């Protein structure tokens, strides 16, 4: 009944257009608002019934609703993540100070006081945003959207609706997160062959702002324009850190509770689920270039900066970039030699000891990611059990119900399958020459 009601509401709407057009998580049109599960479920029903245009319309609406929820969660948690405005004061011990059990009790009380304040802040924030006025989606549904599964259905729906340009964009968007998915790669090559589309025309509908800036910085680096390259790379680095912080904040949204547990195990379950999401942020935000994810993405940006600043004779920044890189790859012998070289000539360039310290944002990022992984490893080692907690493994993506038949490929010829960027080069003298590991092959 509820689904029918939402469906009637949606039928009153005009064409949705691209999923992110005129998007605002603060002022989302009330008439466009519906539960994510409702929009996506109806899209799949229409897909099964071969109502391709209607299916595509609801899939785009679902993608838009998912972004609304993701951005709204990140906004509220980022705005409520500051230090507590007031904290309970520890009760004094018999002699006026806090020792032993009293100190532990006081520390725990302060912690939960901060939790309560943050919960109140989140409640106030979410009360004002459209995304939280409808039922919250399940964890599995959110995982499907994180893996870009809707684009598997969307590209084929667009193809059957004779919207080849949109089919290309949807298929390419899915492959940017799932580059080893052979069937979707076959679809994309088929669509590109029909339209004669080159690599430069491919669009990732979920691309982050730093990705294009990073690629432009690499192109400028390879052309020898080191000044412009450093400007673009610094911007890409700053943009990435902003998106990474937003990703961490978005991992603290609503969580399903499926059984009854003691107080602390229940808290540990929720915290471990949030930890897994935060650890995944690093991989989920890594750009895909030519079908491969950029290995050690943040470290790679510092490596480019190190060499570009050196070529610009800005050795102060070059040394700090080298030290920042070493946080992520301390065994890189070439970078070790670079730092030795800078130290040997420190008098010549007027370098101080602070010039050999990593940059602040690099230290923060390294500490965050390292500590998150350590905590997650602890939960895997000591908290995971059938009775206490299950940290779910990533599931293989299911295939859409309507695959292309061999007949649809007959007579079209072979099309180029390589998506490699010809201009991509590693930085000069990079010590780590290992290729980026591809994602596990999906079903």
Swiss-Prot record:
Glycan-modified residues: 367
Region Disordered: start and end of each range? 81-102, 387-443
Q: Which GO terms describe its biological process?
A: bone remodeling; collagen biosynthetic process; collagen fibril organization; peptidyl-lysine hydroxylation
* Main location, first listed in the record: endoplasmic reticulum
Q: Which cysteines are joined by disulfide bonds?
A: none
Q: Where in the cell is it found?
A: Endoplasmic reticulum
Q: Which residues form the signal peptide?
A: 1-18
Q: Name one GO cellular component term.
A: catalytic complex
The record's listing under InterPro entries reads: Collagen_mod_leprecan, Leprecan_dom, TPR-like_helical_dom_sf
Q: Which keywords, in A-to-Z order, does the entry hold?
A: Endoplasmic reticulum, Glycoprotein, Signal
Q: In which tissues is it expressed?
A: Found in testis, brain, heart and at a much lower level in liver.
Its family remark reads: Belongs to the leprecan family.
What this chain does, per the entry, is described as: Part of a complex composed of PLOD1, P3H3 and P3H4 that catalyzes hydroxylation of lysine residues in collagen alpha chains and is required for normal assembly and cross-linking of collagen fibrils. Required for normal bone density and normal skin stability via its role in hydroxylation of lysine residues in collagen alpha chains and in collagen fibril assembly.
* Name of this protein: Endoplasmic reticulum protein SC65
Q: Which organism is it from?
A: Rattus norvegicus (Rat)
What gene is behind this protein? P3h4
